[in-house]
Design a protein with these regions (language model features):
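ATP-binding N-terminal substructure of ATP-dependent carboxylate-amine bond-forming enzymes
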Residues: 1-79, 83, 98
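Anionic group-transfer/hydrolysis microenvironments
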Residues: 7, 45, 116, 151, ...
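Active-site flanking residues adjacent to catalytic metal/cofactor-binding acidic residues
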Residues: 42, 113, 149, 221, ...
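A short, flexible beta-alpha/helix-coil linker loop
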Residues: 68, 118-120, 238-242
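Active-site nucleotide/adenylate-binding loops and adjacent lid/helix of ATP-dependent enzymes
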Residues: 70-159, 163-182, 186-212
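Conserved metal-phosphate-binding beta-hairpin within the catalytic cores
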Residues: 214-242
Length: 242
C-alpha cells in the first residue's frame, strides 16, 4: 500500500511499500499520489473536503467525498439521518449566543453544545445544565459554529459496523456494546446485552444509512439504546474503533 500523510512519523509508514509526506492542501503532491495508486481511502474523517474532492477527480476514492462531507458536519449528519426516518436527538444549529439562547428554550436542559466540526472524545463540547449560562457554554467551545443536542438518557451505547461494496452488497457485523470512561472508549463487548429484535433493528438502521449514502467502504454507526428506542448518535466514515 501507499500512504499519504502530513506527519513524517506516521506509524503506517513502517508497513507501507511507499509513502508521501505532504500537507493535505499540497495538490501537486496529491496528484502525484493519485497517479501511483488504484484506489484511495482515508482512515479518519478530518481530511479536508476539498482534498477528497480533488482526489476524486484524479482517481477512485472510497468512501466518496459526498459521504465524507455529510459525516464531517454534525448538522448535515443529523439532518440526513432524520430525513431517513431514523431517530436522532433533538437538535438546532447555533451560530451565536442569541441562537444558543433560543435553542436552549426550545430543546431544554440538560443539553449538549458541540462544535459542528472536528470535535471527538468529548472535545469541542459543553454540557448545559440548569446553572449553565449560554454565554459560558458558547465561550467554552470557542464560539465556533455549533449544534445544540438534547441530552439523551440512555441504557446502553452500541455501535454497528457495516460495509458496502461497489455492487451495493451490504454486510453488517454483530453489534458491540460500548463503555466509555471520560469520553474515551474503553471496552467493546460482542454481542451487546440487547434483545435479538433490538440488534436486528440496529443492523437494519445501519443498512439504511450506508445504502442511502451510496457508501463504499466500512462505516461505524453509534447508537443509544433508550428503553425500546434506538437513537443514532453519529456516524464514522471509516473503520470504527469499536
Amino acid at each position: 500500500c501507499h500512504i499519504f500523510a502530513p506527519e513524517g512519523d506516521s506509524p503506517a509508514f513502517q508497513v507501507s511499500a511507499a509513502h508521501i509526506v505532504a500537507g493535505y492542501q499540497d495538490f501537486a503532491a496529491l496528484e502525484a499520489f493519485a497517479k501511483r495508486v488504484d484506489v484511495v481511502t482515508y482512515e479518519f474523517e478530518n481530511v479536508p473536503g476539498d482534498t477528497a474532492a480533488f482526489l476524486e477527480k484524479h482517481c477512485v476514492l472510497a468512501p466518496s467525498s459526498a459521504a465524507l462531507k455529510t459525516a464531517q458536519d454534525r448538522i448535515d449528519e443529523k439532518t440526513f439521518i432524520a430525513g431517513l426516518g431514523i431517530l436522532v436527538a433533538p437538535f438546532a444549529a447555533v451560530n451565536g449566543e442569541a441562537d444558543l439562547e433560543e435553542a436552549i428554550a426550545r430543546i431544554g436542559r440538560p443539553s449538549v453544545l458541540k462544535t459542528r466540526r472536528f470535535g471527538y472524545d468529548g472535545k469541542g463540547q459543553a454540557k448545559i445544565v440548569e446553572e449553565t449560562s449560554a454565554a459560558a457554554a458558547w465561550a467554552e467551545i470557542g464560539k465556533a459554529p455549533a449544534i445544540l443536542e438534547g441530552f439523551i438518557s440512555f441504557d446502553k451505547e452500541i455501535s454497528v459496523i457495516a460495509a458496502r461494496g461497489w455492487d451495493g452488497t451490504i454486510a453488517v457485523y454483530d453489534v458491540p456494546e460500548n463503555h466509555h470512561e471520560n469520553h474515551i472508549l474503553r471496552t467493546s463487548t460482542v454481542p451487546a446485552g440487547i434483545s435479538r429484535a433490538t440488534a436486528e433493528e440496529a443492523r437494519d438502521m445501519a443498512s439504511t444509512i450506508i445504502g442511502a449514502l451510496d457508501y463504499v467502504g466500512v462505516m461505524g454507526i453509534e447508537m443509544f439504546v433508550s428503553g425500546t428506542r434506538l437513537i443514532v448518535n453519529e456516524i464514522a466514515p471509516r473503520v470504527h474503533n469499536s
